[in-house]
């Protein structure tokens, strides 16, 4: 009867237990209703989760998929999630009793009489600390928040990896294009050199013109190894991102229509950053965890209750007597820290300060995310406005180079004008390549800043 009353009282106490500390109600942040710097509307619906698909480049998509599967950082992120899941299961186990089983057998005897006596013993014990003040449940809450933070960190790793792969790939394309332009210019300059040589041999030009043509060729040839080195460097960077060696990186130059494609992406509203940006989500989970830790610290101010029970038995050589001689015990205890109260109060203070700091970190993350998007929009708009100017400049410089060559051939201009026009043409062509590369990279940064690169 007493045992039944004791167990009933414990169950009632457990069911009526409270949850101390503040409840997390979600992080709050104020953002403008619209972006200050706007982007032209997207010409087609494109999910930010896989923004790279908007470039319509199968090779780029394949590289990013490979990186997702093999990159060490992605693997480590998955391991961190598994670790956080294990921590959560460990926290949840605190709600249940701890049970242990013991047993043994022995034999003893007398050397003179050659007799022996066997003995068996065993027992089952259990202990449980009812979560009266909610400390264990707050620990579970903190562990769940830590798991959410680990998942958000993995999504941030994924988003950053996609951006890094795309950037390295765009740099590779730019280097390949620069190499192509340099080789085309070299062919043009070699034809020019032959024309100058013919004019010198015919007595229509001076040897100085021939030497100037030779210098132009040498200067262009010197640029080719630099472009080739950049190509190798980009391939090495991609190999690391893909989690492989450079000999396994096989790239082919996409068509001009593919690498010149500049897609438009939907920017959405600033408020959508709160659920799209992994770093903001991670900061919110950290604030949630810090809030739960306050509850843990407050619960430690109150008495703790523990219950233990034991069932044991022992018998002699007749094992059948083992169960008939079993006994049990049930006990409860209450503990309260008395002389360390100041330290416990300070732990509450520390937890509350950590919560406030986590709140400010969340606010800072949100503000930085908004500013990053605005900076990306400004950069994209500037680069897009420059591209037509570079294209017009290249077209005009090409025409000027051709006209100066014709004037030189008929003797109405000297070779200095030809060399200057060729240099200006080459510079203008390289400006176009650089501008397109920067636009593609700017789009990658913008999509990442908007919270793209992972599926919510």
For every predicted segment, state its role.
Residues 20-23, 50, 56-58, 63-66, ...:
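Small/polar-residue-enriched beta-strand and adjacent coil segments characteristic
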Residues 206, 225-274, 443-456:
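Short, solvent-exposed, mixed-charge loop/turn linkers that connect secondary-structure elements
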Residues 1-6:
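Bacterial N-terminal signal peptides that target proteins for export
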Residues 201-230:
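Repeat-solenoid scaffold signature
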Residues 27-45:
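Post-signal peptide N-terminal segment of mature Sec-exported envelope proteins
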Residues 16-17:
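C-terminal motif of bacterial Sec signal peptides marking the signal peptidase cleavage site
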Residues 77-91, 157, 161-184, 188-198, ...:
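Amphipathic alpha-helical coiled-coil segments
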């Amino acid at each position: 009867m007493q045992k039944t009353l004791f167990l009933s009282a414990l169950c009632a106490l457990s069911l009526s237990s409270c949850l101390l500390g503040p409840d997390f109600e979600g992080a709050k942040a104020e953002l403008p209703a619209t972006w200050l710097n706007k982007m032209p509307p997207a010409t087609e619906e494109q999910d930010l989760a896989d923004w790279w698909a908007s470039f319509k480049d199968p090779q780029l998509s394949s590289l990013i998929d490979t990186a997702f599967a093999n990159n060490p950082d992605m693997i480590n992120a998955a391991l961190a999630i598994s670790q956080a899941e294990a921590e959560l299961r460990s926290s949840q186990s605190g709600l249940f009793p701890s049970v242990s089983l013991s047993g043994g057998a022995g034999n003893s005897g007398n050397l003179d009489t050659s007799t022996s006596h066997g003995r068996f013993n065993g027992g089952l014990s259990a202990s449980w600390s009812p979560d009266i003040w909610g400390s264990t449940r707050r620990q579970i809450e903190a562990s769940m928040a830590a798991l959410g933070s680990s998942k958000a960190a993995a999504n941030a790793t994924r988003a950053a990896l996609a951006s890094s792969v795309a950037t390295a790939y765009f740099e590779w394309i730019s280097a390949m294009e620069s190499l192509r332009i340099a080789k085309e210019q070299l062919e043009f300059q070699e034809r020019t050199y032959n024309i100058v040589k013919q004019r010198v041999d015919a007595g229509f030009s001076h040897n100085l013109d021939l030497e100037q043509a030779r210098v132009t060729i040498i200067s262009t040839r010197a640029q080719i190894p630099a472009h080739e080195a950049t190509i190798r460097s980009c391939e090495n960077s991609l190999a690391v991102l893909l989690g492989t060696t450079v000999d396994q990186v096989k790239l082919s130059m996409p068509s001009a229509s593919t690498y010149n494609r500049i897609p438009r992406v939907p920017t959405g509203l600033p408020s959508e950053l709160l659920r799209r940006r992994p770093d903001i989500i991670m900061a919110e989970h950290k604030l949630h965890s810090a809030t739960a830790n306050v509850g843990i610290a407050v619960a430690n101010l109150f008495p703790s209750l523990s219950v233990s029970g034991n069932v044991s038995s022992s018998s002699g050589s007749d094992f059948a007597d083992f169960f008939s001689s079993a006994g049990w015990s049930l006990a409860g205890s209450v503990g309260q820290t008395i002389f360390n109260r100041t330290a416990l109060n300070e732990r509450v203070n520390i937890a509350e300060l950590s919560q406030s700091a986590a709140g400010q970190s969340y606010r800072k993350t949100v503000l930085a995310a908004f500013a990053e998007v605005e900076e990306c929009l400004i950069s994209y708009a500037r680069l897009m406005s420059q591209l037509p100017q570079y294209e017009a400049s290249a077209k005009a410089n090409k025409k000027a180079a051709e006209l100066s060559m014709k004037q030189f051939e008929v003797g109405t201009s000297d070779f200095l004008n030809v060399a200057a026009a060729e240099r200006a043409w080459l510079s203008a062509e390289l400006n176009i390549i650089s501008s397109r590369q920067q636009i593609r990279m700017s789009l990658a940064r913008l999509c990442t800043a908007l919270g793209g690169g992972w599926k919510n």
